[in-house]
Amino acid sequence: MSHPTTHEFSQYAEVLAALSDPALVPPPPVPVEGPPGASVAWLRGSVARFASGEAHRRRRALVEAELARLAPADVHRAASGADTRSDPRTRVVRGLAAALHMPEPERVAREVGAVADAYFGEDGGPGADRAVARLVALLAPGVVDDTGLEAVANRIGLLVQACAATAALVEAAGDGVPTARVLRDDPPVRVMRRTAARATRVAGREIAEGDEVVLDLGAAQQGHAAPLAFGAPPRACPGRAHALALAEGLLGRPMTPFARLHHQGKALLLPNAWDYASAAALAAEGFEAVGTTSLGVAAGLGLPDGAAATKEATVELAGRLGRGPFLFSVDAEGGFSDNPAEVALLARRLYEAGAAGINLEDGRADGTLAPVELHAAKIAAVKEAVPGLFVNARTDTYWLGIAPERTAGRLAVYERAGADGVFVPGLSDRAGIAALTAALVTPLNVLYSPAGPGIAELGALGVRRVSLGSLLYREALAGAVSTAAAIRDGGPVRGGALPYADVQALAPGDG
């Protein structure tokens, strides 16, 4: 009888191909019998991680449904303020259990800690089996049917899998290191193992049924944009955003109200204003936050957009918007300087004026892109100077039609520099959006396109912010001109204008 062959892969393309191959699955659980609901053997045999085919799809759906009830921002909130003296693994599980509203999170964390090592293949002994039984009794008291037990098994599996990997991320991201940098430079999961459920072929290599595959994520990751620590479809980790929010919360990194809007599990629609009245009117309509449009600011002054000519006007607008009871982010073009220190100073002025976020673009007025290292230096300088300001790093690869294939690579550098979100105007095709969200660690912002997907579909594709850019300003100009022309030509005037008193009421009233 021949023994299984072990295949090792360390090149990025090979590892990604292996992760994406449905024939390669995590090593199946050791075929040891264990009582249902009361043993590690039962747990391993009941979770999505070690299943394939229909069982994997069914169990993965249970995990996805569990996570769908929980916005990443809620995970961050539950993890914030945790006792930093306890073991990182305990803190991770306690925070996630609390966010999922499980009873006695502290006890859940202790029991999961006792299960974790045995779950991943080490001998946990009878103590680990007893911990499984206690968890089942705590999380699903009285449940004995197969369907109910499978559901609770996958709840426990979710906690166990978060235990080690997220704790490693927390430890590696200490001292202010962006988690995006850790995931690419020092991934918490450095090696993954797979078993061939059936014969397949990866990177020109024949893999027989039963062969073992070892994937060196640490080596493969170097120099590549998309982090591999969360796997790839069809087994991509469904809790990536939750794990990152959990880590940030445990690290004590605050999530501002504006940042929280990007971590709600859906797309934030951010309309763009050009003066106080337009911003206040949008806020009065119920929009949770507004952005500014650099075109609207520049055009209102008779200046070209993107020419770094509106620095002081932008700061003045921020000062006016800061008087209002709404969150706002400022479009600051490229920071109005190629000196990172000057950009950081501008960011501080905007923050002190009341801005919750800043948009920094790498496109230049001459139609070229700024060097990626320069733009990253601006981002890093701003985050160091004003940690509480949400930095939305924009790349104009699609907008200017310059090397769109390098988009993910540029954004990876910006994420590593500390960007809180990334913006790709001009990207509107569904496949491109889905591929990019899979490569990112931070929330993706796109520009709304009337010909592209709607807000709900963009959210389903993984987009977390949708900007309207200059659309509203251009619509307002068109409306003003068409109304004047209709009156001149004796035609009908379109109704719907705001009453004079309503516009007056938008003013903050403090001079």
Predicted regions and their residues:
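Extended, intrinsically disordered, low-complexity segments
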Residues: 258, 470-511
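Cytochrome P450 heme-thiolate monooxygenase catalytic core
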Residues: 58, 71-168
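Cytochrome P450 catalytic-core helices
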Residues: 153-179, 238-254
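Conserved cytochrome P450 K-helix E-x-x-R motif and the immediately C-terminal K′/meander segment
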Residues: 140-146, 176-219
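Active-site substrate-recognition loop segments, prototypically the cytochrome P450 B′-helix/B-C loop
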Residues: 1-86, 93-103, 237
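Cytochrome P450 heme-binding Cys-pocket and its upstream "meander" loop
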Residues: 216-245
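Alpha/beta enzyme core
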Residues: 256-328, 336-446, 450-468, 475-477
